[in-house]
Structures are given as structure tokens and as C-alpha cells.
Amino acid sequence: MNSSPPFLLKISAPSTSPQADCPNNYSFPPESPSSCRKGFTPVLTLEVPVAPGKDFNDHLSCNAGLSPNAGNRFTNPPYSREPFSCLTISSPCLPRRIPTPPPPPPVLSSPPPPERCPFEPFSPLLGRLYRQEPAGSSSPCFDRFSLQGSPSPHQRNLCCNYIDSPESQRSCPPSPRLCYVTSPPLIHQAPRASPVTSPELTHITLETGPVISTPLMPGSQGNYSIISPLLTHRPLRPGLAISPPLAHRSVETRPLTPASISHRGPHCPSRRSYNDPPLSSASSPPSGNPYHDNPMPPNSCEPKPQLDVPLGKNGCGPPLSSQAGMSGSPISPQEGCIHYSHLCPDSQISAPRSPFCVINLPPESAGSPSSSLPQALQKPCVGSFLWEPGGNSYLLLTPGTIISGPSCTTGPPLPQCPNPSPYFPSPLNNQCVAPPQSPRGYNEPRPPTSAPPQMKSPKSPESRRNPYKCRSLDNTPHHTPPSHSKSHKTNTCPQPPSQSFGLFSPCMEPAITTTSNSCPKEPPPETAVLKTVAPTSCPHSSPCNPALPSRYPKSSPHVPPPVSPCNTHMYSVVPPTSHLSPLSSPLNQSIPLPQPAVLPCGTYSAPRGPPSHIKSVAPPCSTHIYSFIPLRTPFDPRCLPVVPRARFCPTTVPCGIHTYAVTSPVPLNNPSQIPYSCSLPPSKTSSTCSTSVSSTIVCSDYQSSDSQINHQNKSQSPNKNSSLHNQSKSPLRRGAFQSRSRSRSSSPLQSSTQDRNESTNMGVKHHKRSRKQSQSPADGKIESQSKSLQHRKSVGQIKSPHSKKK
């Protein structure tokens, strides 16, 4: 059995009070000393042998060596003083049970391949979140954990510390995480001949197995807890012990070394750099994995500011921009290993500090063929930390880490998308979030689609970001004949706004629809009812797409209706255009008018392709949601219903104009005065208009002068004229006139009766004064159809009832 490069996992707990972390209710083996009560630091070291030749060499690799001669760190004793800076997990509690069978004992005879520091983050043994079991928890120091599923609601505050300095601790996120930490070399320690890289683990003998116990050898240190099985008859082997066969392939991580040790030269030899060009598919090994070796070693593991060429041939959007810190920060490299195999190569990563992310595989992928691992790696739909209850791959991030960007979504959607349907606004207002599509490796060919090949990279770096691939929904229903089923259209759309969400779901696929600015002169003759389906649920074909298409059902039963894709506009503002009758009101029950079908104004797409015998529905003309008169829509202002006379609008009514018919043709007792009224034609407005106030506009101005009354009245009602003359007779009653003029606008009949009642109570002195005022030149400003006769008649009418009553 060939042994693969070892992998170190250190779980150290800070030494606190003896009784705080380690109560006495935990049962230790009889031969184990009471090191827990003395405040020990448990350490777990693991060696993961994997089958050689099936490595994900294109994956991120860990810091192989902190010295220039990193390839001899496991064979050359002088370099064993340096710590193995690959992974550190600091936790006050250790996993007690690991749901994997006991593997065969490791063989450390064959040396690992040089210049490699492998790491297996996709192990069900290491890469699962710890979840506390409901029963059997013995103590905070040694709790029972199951390594399956999502973290428990009792989140633990772990600490990520260096291997050599446990006092320098940094708080992790609330949930348990795997922290990728590198550490400076321990130069002061003397070299020891041991395969273990850390000097503290030199004399520790470990057994292979998944159960925690504390059998310490006589020569070992007394402040460490060792993972060992219940089978104590197994031969003890010094050094790294646990060796489960995990999917028969190794996954490497590439560390971002701290600035203090960046002067040692290249730390990741024979590994692929960030700016290395994508390898051709001919150079891929026959194992079928999507990661390949790069013959040219990079000069450093530090991330470049931008990846000029994407890592694969899938080509979906802007390239990867790995920023190793905040903007303006002098720290170019970061501590920790960055995993980007789960991301699309054009995603933007911003990790201000170290522990970055962890990817976990489903448990059944341990013995599955080589196709299951890339599928879990490539899953881009990351909604939150715990959106995955089934135990599939997920992503853990630390505070400050932002991942944004599109996803490689070109195939059929996956059913594992997050349960809510998130909707991110876009300039087009019709982008629908789609689930991840057909995860593939970086160098795997794209699945055959109807989309044309993507644009090549232009010269400028800004235009190098290829536009996102957009696929519109099928515009034909499911029962369309084969001759009309070719209605797919692939378009390129502008990029969404470059906003950095906390966890920007990268599975956003905009659906482009065609817009038109031409108004339909008349609705289709065969259109019976047009309905707009509200996007309440997602169709089965696209579980993450919240938009349902709008259908235009036709009256003919044999013709399938066209489907409008991705409807997000549901505001119908098109006026009726199928009749040439004057503008009517909803209160008019006597004139039956045909109610035409109203086309909702929005973004739609007409059926594509030349129709053979089907008359297609003309799309609406407005692309504005809340605009009654769109700017790009020509309209006739004479058709606006704001003039008090009837007009016949032409056949083409501009889209986006509401017809407000507010005039009642029947005289009402208390009609409502609305300034904008559409009256009936002059043939119908007979003497009934004298009592209808809706066709009368009275403008009384009492602020300029007491005796100046501007009266515009075209009716012949004597009551109104007399009331107006009565209002203008006394200059001492200015406030009363103003109040009555206000009330007259609401109910003119009531104010006229009040004036008549008041005029009967007036004396002879007021009549004389009103007669004099009626003969004054101020009365010439009273505008009516007959001035002189009307004044004389009104004065006589005022005089006669008062004289009789007197």
C-alpha cells in the first residue's frame, strides 16, 4: 500500500482552569492519567493516504514547506523543526466519534512526492460540521459530536490559533469551522528524527481509529489527548495515524503565507499559479479529473490581483479577482489556504482575514466514482451557511469575506437550490434567479446548448469581462407542434450592478425579453380574454425562477397561445381602443359599450420566427412600469380627457393613458365637482345642464375688491344670478361672502338658498344700497350673457319679494 503525503490536523484547546473545562463526569480509561484535570491541550494529528496519480493538482495546494527545500521536510530531519502549516482547529471540545470505518494501518515507508503539502478538505472525517448529539454529552471538554449534517443550534465559539503559539487566538464565527492557519517556523527547536513536522508531536504515539481516549506512553508528553480506537490490540505506530481511504484521490490546498515568511522564496513549487493560462484538455491525465498539473512552477503562492484568463474553458463572465485584504491594506498575503474549486472561476473573492472557507462532500462520495467529486466541487449555489440539510457540499465563510459574481449555469437546473426564491433587482427588472446548472470541472467541455459561442476577450481589460449568457424562457407552450417549437433565443445582456452582497447568490440568470415601442392600433380580433398570471410560485422546470410567463389565450381552441417570458410588469394602463364612441364613465349604465381586452404594459416578447398561419399578438408598447405617458410613446394631447367638451379620439390611443370618465349624463341631486370632466356631446346637453353643476365653472374673486365679482355663468338660472347680486350688496360682510363663496364650490344650490333666505330678512336700507351698487360701474364686471336686462330683472326680483314681505 503506497502512502500518500500526510495531512496534519491539530485540535488544541486553551489551557484553562482544571475544573472549568474538564468536569469529572467524563469517563477516562483506567490507564490514562488525569491530564484533563491538569489543563491539557488535546492535539489530533492525522495522515490521509490517498491513491497517487489521482490528485486534484489544479486545486489549491497547501504550504508545502516554510523553507526553501520544502520537498524534503518529511525525509530530511533538519527540516522537521518547522511546523506543518496546513490546518489548525482550535476547540475546547474534540469530536469523539467519527462516522468512518477503521482504515488499515498507514505505511510510512514510502516517502511522499516532493514539493507537496496535501490536504484533504473533502473528507467525511474532517470536512463535516460538528453537531452535538442530544443525549450523552458528558462535559464541555469532551462532548459527543456527530460529523454529519449542519451545525447544532448550540453554536460554539472556537478559536483559530497558530500551531506554535496557542496564546495568539482569534475568535472564529459563531458556528464551528475549519480554520486554515499557517504559522512561522520554530527555529529554536532542535531537529528530531520523526515524520511528524511539529516538534511537540515528536514522541506521541497514535493508534488508528476514530474514538478519543488518552492512552499516553511512558515517554510521551502529558498534556496531549490522542485519538485512538477501542481496539487496543492494534500495533502502535509513531507519528501520524488515521488513514481512511477517501474517494481515492487527494485534494490539495494552496496557502497564502504570512508576510513574515514570504521572503523564503516560492512555497508552492510545481503548483499552478493564479495567473497561469488554462491548460488544454489534451494534457489532462486519463483519470478523468478536471484538475491538471502545470509544468512551469510559479514563483510564489501570493494571490494576484486579478486572474487574466479564467481557470477553465467554461468562460462565464468576468475573471476571478482575488483580493488578499481590504483595499489599501499593506498586507498582500493572507494566512490560510483558500479553496476556490467550489466557485466559478470568475467569482470575486475578498477575504480580509484568514480562515476562509471549507467545502464538504456528501458521505456517499467516499467510494463513488470520480464524477461525484467534481459535481460537489462545482456547486455554486451558495445562499447561506446552513441552507443544506441533506449533508451535501456547502461553504463556510468568516466575517468580512465576500463572494460575489455569476455562476457557471448553462445546463439543467439542480434540485438542491435554496428553498426561497431570491430576487435580486437589475437594470432590466426582469432578471430571474436560477439554480446552479450542471456542475462541471474547469477544463471539461461545455454541454451542447443552443447558445452561440461566447465573445472573445477584447483588448481593453474592462471589456474583457464577457457579458453574461442569457437564455430567455420558451415562448411556446408545451403542446406546441414541432414546426413551432423552435423559439429559443439566446442573447447577451448587460452585467448586473456590481454590488457586493454579504452572500451574493451566484446562481442568477437574467432572462432577456424583447421590448417594442410601437402601439397596437387595435387589439387582435380573435383575442377573447387576456390575463396576466401573477408570479406566485415557481415552475418545476426552473425551481429558482420566481417569474411565470404571461399567456395570451385566444378564442380559437386549436391554436396554441403564445407565451410571454419572465413577466414582471403587471400594470395595465392601456385605454380602450376598440370603439369610436365618446369617452364614457363607469356610472353610465344606459350606453352599453363593448369592453375590449386590455393589454398590460410591460416587457414582453413577441413570438419569434415567421408565423405560418397564426396571427401573432402585437406586444404592448410601453417599457415603463409606472409612467402613464411614456416618453418614447407619441401621443396626441387633444385626446387627453381634460377639456369640458366631447372629443372623438382617433383609433390609435397612446399606450399609458388612463381614461378617467367622471361626468354623469343623468342629473344628480348632489353631483360631485371634478375639474377634469368629459361631458356628453352637445346634442344631449340640453336644459338639464342648467341644474348640473359639473358643466359650470364659477370663479369668484373677493380678494381684489369687495365689489368686483368675476362671474362666468352660461346658464339662465335666475336663482344663481340673484344670489350673486345679493352677495355683492354689502361691503361690511366681506368675511361672510368669502365663506359663502367657498361653500358654493361644493354645493352651489345650498348657498343660493341661503342667500335668498338672507335677502328676505334684509331691510329697505339694504335694498337701496344694493340698487345703488347694481348701478355702479363695478357691476359692469359681472360677466353674463345679458348684462343690462339681467341686472334689471335681478333687481326687480329682489325688490318684489322683499316688498311683499314687508
From Swiss-Prot:
Residues 277-290, 710-723, 733-754 have a biased composition (Low complexity). Residues 13-27, 320-329, 773-788 have a biased composition (Polar residues). Isoforms 3 and 4 are expressed in testis (at protein level). Coiled coil: none annotated. Residues 521-806 are annotated as: Interaction with CRISP2. Interacts with CRISP2. Plays a role during spermatogenesis. This is Sperm head and tail associated protein. It comes from Mus musculus (Mouse).
